[in-house]
Design a protein with these regions (language model features):
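Domain-scale signature associated with acetyltransferase and cell-envelope carbohydrate enzymes
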Residues: 1-154, 182-183, 201, 217, ...
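Glycine/small-residue-rich pyrophosphate-binding loop that anchors the diphosphate of NDP-sugar donors
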Residues: 91, 116, 136, 175-178, ...
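Conserved SAM-binding loop
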Residues: 116, 139, 157-164, 192, ...
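Beta-rich strand-turn-strand
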Residues: 133-139, 190-202, 209-212
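A short acidic, glycine-rich active-site loop
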Residues: 167-179
Length: 255
């Protein structure tokens, strides 16, 4: 009798003997070691510290140097966390000072564009699983927050014509357009910003919004397609939209 047949008999519990083996396997599977809180709490923090230190060493001696080597410019105090971004196509990358970029991101340049360029301004943050596809240009201003799983789509991945798609032709160059994100913008998680859009200074894009048109400065947009749902007043010190908010009717449109 082979091992597979033996395992089948145990799972089926065919008779007293195989039922006993099954019960023994269940007991073995549920054996637990006792938890000693002081000891295991210490071991937990030791593991956590060792893991963090290992990630720190990998970041400063491996991940960041590799990523910087393919960028046109990287400013001071740049922080790359959780690995190295996946980069597709030819892409000129310019990064300012005090920028934090999550390594689990995708940065892609359109192959039909002569010089697709990505600019990330001072003090900006790019979160987890963000996708940025660059047509001619994606320009992110200063102190911009781009949350997890945001997509900035600067060009079409495929042509609209089905025959061209079947022939594996790229989308026409003319279908790529810039995306401009001005200073102090917050793009919330899972939002999508499409090609040709400008997000005005101090604006906020709500979670899951799909932005198809320009967003005025100091407004909040939500929905699909995104519409203005609130207007913000800049803070008196000019640091951003920290003042009074005015709701907008459901049918108000961008612009």
């Amino acid at each position: 009798m082979g091992l597979q047949q033996l395992a089948m008999k145990i799972r089926r519990r065919e008779g007293v003997f195989y039922n006993g083996l099954y019960q023994l396997a269940v007991r073995i599977r549920h054996i637990k070691s006792p938890t000693i809180p002081p000891l295991h709490r210490f071991l937990y923090y030791e593991w956590k510290s060792r893991r963090a230190f290992g990630h720190y060493l990998k970041r400063i001696f491996y991940n960041e140097p590799l990523f910087k080597s393919i960028c046109r410019k990287v400013g001071d105090r740049f922080c790359l966390v959780n690995g190295i971004p996946w980069i597709e196509g030819q892409l000129d990358i310019y990064i300012g000072d005090n920028v934090t970029l999550n390594g689990i991101t995708t940065l892609a340049g359109a192959t039909v564009q002569e010089k697709p360029s990505l600019y990330i301004g001072d003090g900006s943050y790019i979160g987890y699983q963000v996708t940025i596809t660059v047509g001619p240009l994606v320009k992110i201003g200063r102190n911009v927050l781009i949350a997890d799983r945001v997509s900035l789509i600067g060009y079409d991945g495929h042509p609209l014509d089905p025959v061209a798609r079947a022939n594996h032709q790229p989308a026409p160059k003319e279908e790529g357009h810039p995306i401009i994100i001005e200073d102090n913008v917050w793009v919330c998680s899972n939002a999508t910003v499409l090609k040709g859009v400008t997000l005005g200074e101090g604006s906020v894009v709500a979670t899951h919004a799909v932005v198809t048109a320009d967003v005025p400065p100091y407004t909040v947009v939500a929905g699909n397609p995104a519409r203005v749902v609130k207007r913000l007043s800049p803070s008196s010190d000019g640091a951003g939209a920290g003042g009074r908010a005015e709701p907008v009717g459901h049918h108000a449109e961008n612009g």
